[in-house]
């Protein structure tokens, strides 16, 4: 997917977070120009690659998104922004729906209005709930058991619906807990 777009502009949300910052570094190393949107609520600006452009604001800010999208042509958007703590999602389910679904939807509606319709979305394997086997396959039963997973699945369903309308192309990443150190 990325080889088809080499030397292009990429818009990346959540690039000051653990996964997003690692992806940003890899994209820059591969020759991409990366613009990062991050509100820095949970991210750390020190993780952002020096060669990336960092825009600090919330992804639901249509005016600022429009300004960025009108400044250059982006080949794709990689969406890593969002809230990620399962325990917190149980205490504040509406907050997780707001950040992981509602704000993401506003962001992508704005992107699509500018013709930016290639999307890679960072979801979670938590959408499978408690699987019956250690080998989880993409086509296994979806059964989220916490508000975090439900908010991610809700946005996945939004992407699927928009693809059926012919408005976008997407890749959804459903990985398990990511851990590591820099």
Where are the language model's segments positioned?
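N-terminal Rossmann-like NAD(P)+-binding domain of SDR-like oxidoreductases, especially those catalyzing
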Residues: 1-181
């Amino acid at each position: 997917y990325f080889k088809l777009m080499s030397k292009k502009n990429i818009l990346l949300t959540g690039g000051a977070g653990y996964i997003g910052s690692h992806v940003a570094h890899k994209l820059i190393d591969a020759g991409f120009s990366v613009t990062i949107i991050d509100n820095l609520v949970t991210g750390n600006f020190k993780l952002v690659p020096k060669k990336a452009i960092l825009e600090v604001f919330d992804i639901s800010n249509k005016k600022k998104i429009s300004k960025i999208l009108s400044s250059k042509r982006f080949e794709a958007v990689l969406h890593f922004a969002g809230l990620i703590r399962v325990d917190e999602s149980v205490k504040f389910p509406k907050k997780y729906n707001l950040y992981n679904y509602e704000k993401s939807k506003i962001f992508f509606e704005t992107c699509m209005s500018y013709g930016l319709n290639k999307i890679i979305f960072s979801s979670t394997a938590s959408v499978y709930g408690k699987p019956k086997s250690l080998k989880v396959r993409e086509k296994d039963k979806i059964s989220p058991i916490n508000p975090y997973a439900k908010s991610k699945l809700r946005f996945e369903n939004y992407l699927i619906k928009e693809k059926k309308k012919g408005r976008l192309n997407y890749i959804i990443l459903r990985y398990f807990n990511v851990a590591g150190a820099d």
